[in-house]
């Protein structure tokens, strides 16, 4: 087939994809209206039933807590006097924390670019080693495989163990799951709470499963039960697991809202709420779902945590509306979008976008033959149709590749991710469904086959490499289609002390806009999931 025919075929595919997106958008709109109508009919009855159930639970809970205080008052007093850090009644800094020289604390904060906004002026010092914190044995034993707490863990744990609301602003791969997971599980074991008390919301199925896996590791050998709730699989199995007595639920917003509207899940006993990748959830249009979920949990007695890679106005407003004097812990300068300086960024400007596929093959051959030949490589396509085409191209060129995109079932995506993590396959092809939050260790190379729709997504893609203190390389193909992002890309490169190609400067500093030459204003619909809006 000639190059002209190929070009026409691609243009036809792109136009066809746009029509599919428009149709899907209208369908989603209609489904949303139907769901809203259904919800309004059920609201009055559910509100009354929920209030009665909530009042009854709170009354029983207060009664149990009063009995517990009567039975164990002397033990709590003794525990405090011996500097036990975590009980169900608060946190006390140990002598080991107090004995750390202030110069060492200052160096830790400076080296890791840590800032803490502490509205209640608690002035808790960071936990620099695991022997400085007293946790339940079943929890502390799971931490021995790590050398020391990560910065976000070091600084946030004291506040979280004291029951304070916390906002954590840090890059992905910073240890956020254990930052909120360790206090959550420790509190459940300490209080012997049998109710559903911990809820973690995340933007994608893959991230929800990853968090679930980490919490499962943390709870192994205990009576604490975790359940993952996400779209693309049967609701019935998930409902059954919740009703069998879950203590912790990790969920995507769309599926959880479905279960709430169906009356299949009761969140009235939640006392520890985590919003992970909050900025990403708002970008994906989950704001109303998040508000509904938060409104289904108790307003009083709830500890709320929010973790985010950036701190835009929308995230700040969410924190102001639903959090109580939160402590804000920031790792690095996250107010301004920036890339990890440990990542080498290579931007290759192409005059002809149809060169990308040939260049990708050459690049993969080069990187796979570097070192021991076992480097993990992550290739990003923009949308699922492109990913499917590139997957076929790589197979034809004898590459062993795993793939994650919207045309695959949840089982296929999970298997692909596991294959990549385990090293069975060292090449993963993904759309932006995998761009945030996923903990894929030891990714050496990220290749941006097609530049993403926003500069934020570019930075998020880069974050798949250079994790946990390691270095990485990001190779990006840039074409005239993305020239409106050239100015923002130049800023990111300069901010990370990376060279700016002369060919990129020719496009000048265009104003950023979240559109695409094919999809236009439908950019948010790119790579829609199989059966619901969460990926």
Swiss-Prot record:
Domain Helicase C-terminal: residue ranges: 362-508
Composition skew (Basic and acidic residues), residue ranges: 1-21, 55-72
Keyword ATP-binding: yes
TM regions (residue ranges): none
Disulfide bridge partners, by residue number: none
Family annotation (Pfam families): DEAD, Helicase_C
Enzyme Commission (EC) number: 3.6.4.13
Compartments where found: Nucleus, Nucleolus
UniProt motif (DEAD box) ranges: 276-279
Ranges of residues in domain Helicase ATP-binding: 157-329
Chain positions recorded as ATP binding sites: 170-177
Keyword rRNA processing among UniProt keywords: yes
CDD domains (UniProt xref): DEADc, SF2_C_DEAD
Compositional bias (Low complexity): 79-88
Alphabetical list of InterPro entries matching this protein: DEAD/DEAH_box_helicase_dom, Helicase_ATP-bd, Helicase_C-like, P-loop_NTPase, RNA-helicase_DEAD-box_CS
Molecular function via GO: ATP binding; ATP hydrolysis activity; RNA binding; RNA helicase activity
Record comment regarding domains: The Q motif is unique to and characteristic of the DEAD box family of RNA helicases and controls ATP binding and hydrolysis.
Family: Belongs to the DEAD box helicase family. DDX5/DBP2 subfamily.
Protein's name according to its UniProt entry: ATP-dependent RNA helicase DBP3
Organism: Lodderomyces elongisporus (strain ATCC 11503 / CBS 2605 / JCM 1781 / NBRC 1676 / NRRL YB-4239) (Yeast)
């Amino acid at each position: 087939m000639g190059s002209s025919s190929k070009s026409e075929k691609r243009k036809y595919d792109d136009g066809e994809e746009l029509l599919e997106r428009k149709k899907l958008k209208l369908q989603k709109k209609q489904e949303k209206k139907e769901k809203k109508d259904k919800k309004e009919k059920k609201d009055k009855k559910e509100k009354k039933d929920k209030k009665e159930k909530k009042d009854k639970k709170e009354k029983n809970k207060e009664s149990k807590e009063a009995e517990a205080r009567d039975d164990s008052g002397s033990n709590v007093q003794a525990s405090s006097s011996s500097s036990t850090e975590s009980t169900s009644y608060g946190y006390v800094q140990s002598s080991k924390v107090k004995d750390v020289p202030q110069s060492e604390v200052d160096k830790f904060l400076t080296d890791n670019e840590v800032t803490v906004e502490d509205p209640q002026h608690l002035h808790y010092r960071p936990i620099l080693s695991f022997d400085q914190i007293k946790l339940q044995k079943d929890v502390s034993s799971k931490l021995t495989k790590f050398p020391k707490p990560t910065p976000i863990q070091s600084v946030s744990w004291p506040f979280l163990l004291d029951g304070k609301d916390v906002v954590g602003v840090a890059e992905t791969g910073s240890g956020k799951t254990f930052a909120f997971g360790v206090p959550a599980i420790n509190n459940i074991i300490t209080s012997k709470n049998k109710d559903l008390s911990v809820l973690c919301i995340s933007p994608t199925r893959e991230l929800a499963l990853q968090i679930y896996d980490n919490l499962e590791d943390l709870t192994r050998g205990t009576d604490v039960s975790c359940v993952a709730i996400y779209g693309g699989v049967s609701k019935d199995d998930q409902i059954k697991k919740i009703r069998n007595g879950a203590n912790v639920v990790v969920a995507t917003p769309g599926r959880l809202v479905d279960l709430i509207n169906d009356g299949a899940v009761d969140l009235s006993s939640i006392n520890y709420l985590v919003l992970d990748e909050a900025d990403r959830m708002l970008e994906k249009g989950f704001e109303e779902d998040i508000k509904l979920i938060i409104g289904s949990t108790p307003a009083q007695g709830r500890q709320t945590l929010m973790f985010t890679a950036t701190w835009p106005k929308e995230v700040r407003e969410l924190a102001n509306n639903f959090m109580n004097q939160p402590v804000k812990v920031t790792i690095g300068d996250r107010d301004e979008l920036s890339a990890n300086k440990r990542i080498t960024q290579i931007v290759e400007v192409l005059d002809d976008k149809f060169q990308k596929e040939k260049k990708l093959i050459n690049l993969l051959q080069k990187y796979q033959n570097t070192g021991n030949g076992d480097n993990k490589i992550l290739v990003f396509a923009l949308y699922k149709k492109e990913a499917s085409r590139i997957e076929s191209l790589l197979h034809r060129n004898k590459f062993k590749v795993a793939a994650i995109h919207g045309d695959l079932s949840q089982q296929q995506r999970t298997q692909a991710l596991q294959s990549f993590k385990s090293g069975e396959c060292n090449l993963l092809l993904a759309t932006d469904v995998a761009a945030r939050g996923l903990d894929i260790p030891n990714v050496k190379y990220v290749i941006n086959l097609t530049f993403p729709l926003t500069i934020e997504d570019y930075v998020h893609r880069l974050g798949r490499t250079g994790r946990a203190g390691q270095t990485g390389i990001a190779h990006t193909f840039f074409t005239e289609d993305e020239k409106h992002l050239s100015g923002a890309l130049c800023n990111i490169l300069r901010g990370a002390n990376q060279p700016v190609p002369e060919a990129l400067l020719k496009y000048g500093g265009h104003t950023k806009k979240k559109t695409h030459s094919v999809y236009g204003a439908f950019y948010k619909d790119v790579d829609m999931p199989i059966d619901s809006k969460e990926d």
